[in-house]
Swiss-Prot record:
Active site: residue positions: 303 (proton acceptor)
Record keyword Translocase present: no
Name of the protein: 3-phosphoshikimate 1-carboxyvinyltransferase
Entry-linked InterPro entries: Enolpyruvate_Tfrase_dom, Enolpyruvate_Tfrase_sf, EPSP_synthase, EPSP_synthase_CS, RNA3'P_cycl/enolpyr_Trfase_a/b
Protein species of origin: Dehalococcoides mccartyi (strain ATCC BAA-2266 / KCTC 15142 / 195)
Length: 420
């Protein structure tokens, strides 16, 4: 689907959807608990539904209670799958479930979608090999021959993706001797590991970490069933937070300002750039003011790159966004996608290995190729609503994490014309 955005000044009030990361973590923890758990306010989007579908294929009974806005699971009823398990384009699903399947006493075959095939799995595969697991990738299929895991020590790099580490943390309680995880390099996206630990604790799991998080110890122990409430998603909110800074005042609810989520730092960045930011219990309000350039380290909040970049494009001066190297291995090469998109809109951008340098100016409308990347589509959707005369290809890709993004933008006064 291709959409066109005509010029507008969107503003008003919205509630952002629930967190993708917490929904997937909660599902996988609940699936390993004996008894019934309830996931309250889960996100129903492509990535989370991929996790749900894979768990269902493994024998986990998951029911939707529409009235209570929750999913109810009966855990630890794993059985050999009848066929392949499709992870769609969800890297978290593929990586987390590869680890979970590794401790099940049968073979599992996880299928990756087209763009997911390009995202690296090797560090996790090597870590599972250290634990004696037979796992290999054949084209778009990851084949895991699982069984009881008796080894208890594993080492892997921490600076490529926190998802490899979270995957091991989620499987660790079911290992015969637990796991001692050593990170050979400091962890990137550390807040995501804290989110995993928080989820484990919600299901009765005790996990121990060193101060620098390069040593993680999780003893063998049972997951306990739980009522698990999913908070709002700061990553999905980021494009609307940016919109509030460049367009008109925007009140956003369902955001916990005390969250472990890395991307809540977006409001700190916007405040430093000059936007007016107010917050309270479960809400944030952002209002536009003259913006100045920023130097921001995104090492632990890499998903903010597109939203912060479109804000920097509207700010006075040269912004430097650093710590962005790993953005090249997301759903698209986001450094290249952001650079090409802003360049098409008349903004000078310089790509470096680990930095993006943006000369603020007056962006104009342009043809934007989202490359099927939901965060690129949402960020340029926000900017395009302000500039007008902007078309975005593969706009339906927002269904990965925010299925009604375009409807929300319209509800704020954005002029969105679909199927152009």
């Amino acid at each position: 689907m291709k959409i066109r955005l005509d010029k507008s000044l969107p503003g008003g009030e919205i509630a952002v959807p629930s967190s993708k990361s917490y929904t997937i973590r909660g599902l996988i923890a609940a699936a390993q608990a004996n008894g019934q758990s309830r996931i309250i306010s889960p996100l129903a989007a492509d990535d989370t539904l991929a996790s749900r579908q894979v768990l269902s294929g493994l024998g986990i009974d998951i029911n939707t209670d529409a009235e209570a806005e929750s999913w109810q699971l009966t855990g630890n009823t794993f059985k050999k799958p009848a066929g392949n398990l499709f992870c769609r384009e969800s890297a978290a699903t593929l990586r987390f479930m590869s680890a979970v399947c590794a401790r099940l006493p049968f073979e599992c075959r996880l299928l990756a979608g087209h763009s997911l095939m390009r995202r690296p799995m090797l560090p996790l595969i090597q870590a599972l090999h250290q634990l004696g697991i037979e796992i290999e990738t054949r084209g778009n299929t990851t084949v895991i021959k699982g069984g009881e895991i008796t080894r208890s020590k594993v080492s892997l790099p921490g600076n490529i993706s926190s998802q490899y580490v979270s995957a091991l943390m989620l499987m660790a309680p079911a290992c015969k001797s637990g796991l001692e995880i050593h990170l050979a390099t400091p962890p990137a996206s550390l807040p995501y590991l804290k989110m995993t630990k928080q989820t484990l604790e919600s299901f009765g799991i005790k996990a121990y970490t060193s101060i620098d998080w390069q040593e993680i110890s999780i003893p063998p122990q049972p997951y306990l069933p739980a009522r698990y409430r999913v908070e709002g998603d700061w990553s999905s909110a980021s494009s609307f937070l940016a919109l509030g800074a460049i367009a008109a005042p925007l009140f956003i609810s369902n955001l916990d300002t005390e969250s472990f989520q890395a991307d809540r730092i977006m409001i700190k960045f916007l405040s430093e750039m000059g936007a007016e930011v107010e917050s309270g219990q479960n809400w944030v309000k952002v209002s536009p003011k003259p913006l100045t350039a920023i130097q921001a380290d995104l090492t632990h909040s890499i998903d903010l790159l597109p939203a912060l970049a479109i804000t920097a494009a509207c700010a006075k001066g040269q912004s430097i966004l650093s710590g962005v190297r790993q953005a090249r291995i997301k759903e698209s090469n986001r450094i290249r996608a952001v650079s090409q998109g802003l360049s098409a809109m008349g903004i000078n951008v310089t790509e470096e290995d680990d930095r993006l340098i943006i000369e603020g100016g007056m962006p104009r409308g342009a043809e934007i190729d989202s490359l099927g990347d939901h965060r690129i589509a949402m960020a340029f959707g926000a900017l395009g609503a302000v500039t007008g005369e902007t078309c975005i290809s593969e706009a339906e890709c927002v269904s990965k994490t925010y299925p009604d993004f375009w409807q929300k933008l319209e509800s704020l006064g954005g002029k969105v014309i679909k199927d152009v």
